[in-house]
Amino acid sequence: MRLLMIGCTGFIGNELVPYLLRNGHHLTIVSRSKARTFTKELLSSKDITYLECNPAEESNWSKGALIDALDAADGVINLAGEPIAERRWTSSHCQELVNSRLKTTRGIIKAMNQLKRPPRVLINASAIGFYGTSSDKNFTEESECGEHFLG
C-alpha cells in the first residue's frame, strides 16, 4: 500500500514506520523538519519518500508535492501534533497544540474531498488526554470528553 504519513516522527511514528516498511508498504513521510529520530538506513530506503513542509499550512494542500503525494496514496495516517509535554502550557503554546492538530486534519479532509480518487482510508490519531483522567474508569471512543483544555 502507498501510505501518506503525517507527523510520524514522534512516539508512535518511530515504531510504526519501520513496522510498515517491514510489511512491504511504500511510505511518503511528511514532516516540518528532517526526522532526526530515523536512522540513515531507514531514510535511505527505496520505499520512503520524504517531504519537508508544514501540513498545518493550508496553502501546502492546494498544489505541489504534498497534494501530488495525497493523490497517489492509498491511505493516510495522520499523527500530527505539536508535542504536549515538551513546554509549559502557556496560552500561546496551547493554541499551537490545537492548531497543529486541527489545521492539519482540516487540510487533509479538504484536500481529499477535492480529489477525483481520494485515498481509501484515513487514520487520524490524537491522544487519550481528550477524555480526562480517572483511576477507576475505562475510556472508549464513546466516552464523553474531559472538562479541561485537552477535552
Task: Give short role names for the model-derived ranges.
Residues 11, 19, 52, 62, ...:
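Soluble, non-transmembrane catalytic domains of enzymes that act on hydrophobic metabolites at membranes
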Residues 36-44:
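Short loop/helix-cap segments at secondary-structure boundaries that form the rim of catalytic
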Residues 3-25:
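N-terminal Rossmann NAD(P)H-binding glycine-rich loop of SDR-like oxidoreductase domains
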Residues 15-16, 39, 87-88, 132-135:
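Short glycine-/acidic-enriched loop or helix-start segments at secondary-structure transitions
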Residues 94, 106-148:
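Conserved Rossmann-fold NAD(P)-dependent oxidoreductase catalytic core, especially the SDR/UDP-sugar
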Residues 6, 30, 76-80, 122-128:
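SDR active-site strand-loop-helix element
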Residues 30-35, 55:
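N-terminal Rossmann-fold cofactor-binding loop
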Residues 44-107:
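NAD(P)H-binding glycine-rich loop region in Rossmannoid oxidoreductase-like domains
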